[in-house]
């Protein structure tokens, strides 16, 4: 299941709770066409990679998180491990998303 995170406190808690697991964060918005296109694929990754934590953040609902993470465009995918950001890219690129998951998990 993809976790929906609504504020910075919740985001920090998710990073801490994940420990050494990879966290993949999808920063998106309801009005963003490319975000809507990649969303089903992002959600399908949960089944394929059960040891990875998947988080979705709506930048309009959680502006504090988007600002803290320096998100400039949507969709932006950030990858965290051991409470540290290890990778980031922007754009609805399915291949790039799955390659990064495989690389960092």
UniProtKB/Swiss-Prot annotation:
Q: What is one GO biological process annotated to this record?
A: positive regulation of DNA binding
Query: Mind telling me which SUPFAM superfamilies this protein's record contains?
Result: Thioredoxin-like (SSF52833)
Alphabetized Pfam families for the sequence: Thioredoxin
Please indicate which residues carry the site annotation Contributes to redox potential value. Answer: 33-34
InterPro entries assigned to the protein according to its UniProt record, in alphabetical order = Thioredoxin (IPR005746), Thioredoxin-like_sf (IPR036249), Thioredoxin_CS (IPR017937), Thioredoxin_domain (IPR013766)
Task performed by this protein: Participates in various redox reactions through the reversible oxidation of its active center dithiol to a disulfide and catalyzes dithiol-disulfide exchange reactions. Plays a role in the reversible S-nitrosylation of cysteine residues in target proteins, and thereby contributes to the response to intracellular nitric oxide. Nitrosylates the active site Cys of CASP3 in response to nitric oxide (NO), and thereby inhibits caspase-3 activity.
Q: What name is this protein filed under?
A: Thioredoxin
Q: Which organism is it from?
A: Ophiophagus hannah
